[in-house]
Amino acid sequence: MKVVLLALSGNTARDKLTELYPEAEIESISRTEFETGSVMKRLATLRARRPDVFAIATERLAWQRGQDLFMIFGALAGAREVVMIDAHGGLRRESRFDLLAGAPATLADEATTGLIDLLYSRRELLTLEHEKYGFLVNKTDRPRVVYLRATPGPGTQAGGAASHIKGVVEALARLGTEVQIISNDAIAGFDNPKLPFTIISPETVGATRALFDIHNNLVFTRAAVPLIERAAPDFIYQRYARFSWAGVVAASRIQRPLFLEYNGSEVWVGRHWDHVGSLDLLERYERLNLEAAARIFVVSEVERQNLEARGVPAAKIVVNPNGVDAELFRPGAGGAEVRRELGIGGDEVVAGFVGTFGPWHGVVQLAEAVKKVPANLRVRFLFVGSGSLYGEVERLLQAETASGRVIFTGTVAHERVPQLLDACDILVSPHVPLADGSDFFGSPTKIFEYMAMGKGIVASRLGQIGEVLSDNETALLVEPGNVTQLASAIIKLVETPGLCAQIGSNARGVAVQNHTWTRNAERVLEAYDNVG
């Protein structure tokens, strides 16, 4: 028996497949290979593999758009059985006969629903674009806030977004704000039972990513707005999301200010990184959110300039960089135990990277730098996380992984991140410039987490990173994308432990003083005090 495995995201699920099909040979097909060419060419590519079982691995079944199409595709390619597995134990399993028998009705239903959603959304968007967005201000020492998370993707993945949400919500609560959270998924690492938390689950409807997002905007808005009306908040705080208008509709309905956390243009992301499609329509959703918001919180000065260039009034924009929970991310957070688990000796230096293996994180450049570090230098490298470039990095470091010099952990639980960071002596943030030449607009959460850990830091001198960190004081800064400089900086900290320790101590002091989530939340409440 042969299982052909397509890993869209998340865990590759080999262990689960081995459990389901113990006698099977498991053969992988890359996402790039699968997505190359026309539908007929893709079908021929998969047929040529002669699968008995076609398996699709995804992060979360609840968030996998086009499930039915993937399943039917596998059946058309000749697989006797098609399974979809997620990284959290979810499983969908159907026979070829059942899939093909139900295919006409399934495809007709997908097409009809998509058309209805699109027509309805275009009509509603036109109405919302012509509204005037005023609000009443109810000033109080203990404001009530509804926090909206409507991002079209799972919230259970550890990373900067999860840290941001958790950090802001908990800091607002600590400052005396009554916070109610309405989200379309659980949030990694968030387990505060004292804060009301409602989850509006998505529906796996929509053949394309844009249609999936548009449909689930309607699902989320219909459920969230009545909840917000009952909560009667003094302001709504929404993390801006692709194809979303829930905060706009709710703020208009209750006549309260909408505070929009804007981490970057989804239109830009859709054009350069994440090809979601329907960009003209997405641009209208984005403009609607920016116009309806009473205040827009951006993470960097570059993003403020980007918005002003688009005509957003400067008075609406608040620069509010990311932060860190300095009590959670601290020296002595459990690194000694992690080192024992991983077989790392007490006299070995560990240089670590934690984050997404994505286009601008520079993880490929870090892999190339690792190969330039002399083999006789007593240093090991720890890579924590996953993403679209994981396979390429793993391939580049095949020999180093085999020798034990490089360790990959894959995706880890959010609460384990401080322990893994604490296991390191040096932390690396090798971000690279944006591919289209745009100014770097990010505020990487990992920078503040690295600083709070009190470790030596090597980072790219790029955008806000180069403003927050000072060369030779709180980090060694290198030119973005310069592999030789990156390797040299790592070597320097390995060979001069005194400098490494001093940089770490300085960095933690600055993080605790200036870059906590409490300070981030204070800026939100200062904006509330001054709005109106």
What are the language-model segments listed below?
Residues L99-L126, V249-R253, Y262, E266, ...:
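Membrane-proximal helix-turn-helix segments that form the acceptor-binding/catalytic region
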